[in-house]
Amino acid sequence: MSQKVENLDILAAILPALAGPDRAEQLARLLTDEDIDTLRHIAREGMGENSLRALTSDFSYLEGWCLVATGSPLPWPAPVPLILKFIAHHLWDPDKKMSDPDHGMPDHVARALVAQKLLRTQKKSENLRPPHAPATVQRRLASWSTLHRWRGLTGPFSAAEVRSAMRLAVRVADRPRTRKSRKAITADCLEVLLRTCEGDDMCGPNLTDIRDRAVLLVGFASGGRRRSELSGLRVGQITWEEFLPLDPSDPDSELLPAASLRLGRTKTEESSDDNTVLLIGRTVDALKKWLDASQITDGAVFRAIDQWGNLKTRALTPQSVNAIVKKRCALAGLDPQDFSAHGLRSGFLTEAANRDIPIQDAMLQSRHRSLAQASSYYSDAGRSRRRSARMLG
């Protein structure tokens, strides 16, 4: 019974009808373990596993912060002063913090959050702790607002005071946005990584090499898929297409194998029939070679392989996809700290910009919804070629 109540308490963060200890105990008596598993599956699938994970993490942080900062649990609905306190504790002027320890998040609050593992340990003085990333603060405020709506409440997150405080705090914090991957994995870099998947002269590529090659090629060629999309890819999402010409304007050009991937729900898109991307050429060959070598005919496409080379039934995790990229970078003599799986996504758009592919064309493959976000990669790629920077020679 206690385990069922605990599971329902976890669900209460996202399903308001389950909120409250009395309600949880009542439902624990009525619901079977299978019923609770079904509810958890609906909650996870209905909003996406990553979104659910982020919301749960944000809820835990907000609860922990409020308890430490005010001595009380989160109130529902949240008053404006509490939201303003949250902003002040997470976005501040780093220079003023150096001279005034009471500026920004108080030291005792930071230490308590570190002790609860809700905040990273600061190796140096707490005065040197940087403010939070504005995007993180904005996401947590959005999660807080979402939790209000799911409880049938209206939070004051759109109040003029909150919007003004957030806008000014972001300006004062002056923390530049950093890329998820310091360096983009462009086509040249990708070729270097692929060479590490060729195996040695004696044995050739092993099963791990074949898998990693397919992960890298599919991750890049499909528009720079997110690591969660690669780890969640299922055989049923693949459709093998007729061979297509290398040059679509020349029907007599070389014919290449093709396949389409139905992406389903992604971070920015709901599942729909047109949410598909096309793969052509050696990427399709690499994907087929992996499926043939692994004898995978259904379920997860990319799966774990143990240290003895045995294929597992479980899918790769998003973290495993990231580890594959870093491992191949290390084998290629590159610094793994400079790269992550997101480098495949940024690298795809950067490469498209370098080849003067229209941004709208690239976005159809990458499935970016924001022109501004996609344009940032095009701007970075074109910076070194700008004529305006060469006016004085």
What are these regions (language model features)?
Residues D37-L52, F59-R179, G199-G204:
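N-terminal core-binding DNA-recognition domain of tyrosine recombinases/integrases
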Residues L217, L344-R369, R385:
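C-terminal catalytic core of tyrosine-transesterase DNA break-rejoin enzymes
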Residues M1-A19, L392-G393:
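C-terminal secondary-structure termini that scaffold catalytic or DNA-interacting sites
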Residues P156-C197, R265-K267, D306-K312:
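Flexible interdomain linker/hinge and immediately adjacent N-terminus
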Residues S366-M391:
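Catalytic-site neighborhood detector that most strongly recognizes the C-terminal catalytic loop/helix
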Residues G219-P257, Q360-L364:
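Short, charged phosphate-coordinating catalytic segments
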Residues E191-R227:
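Basic, Lys/Arg- and aromatic-enriched nucleic-acid-binding interface segment
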Residues D247-L311, Q319-R328:
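Basic, alpha-helical nucleic-acid-contacting "clamp/cap" segments
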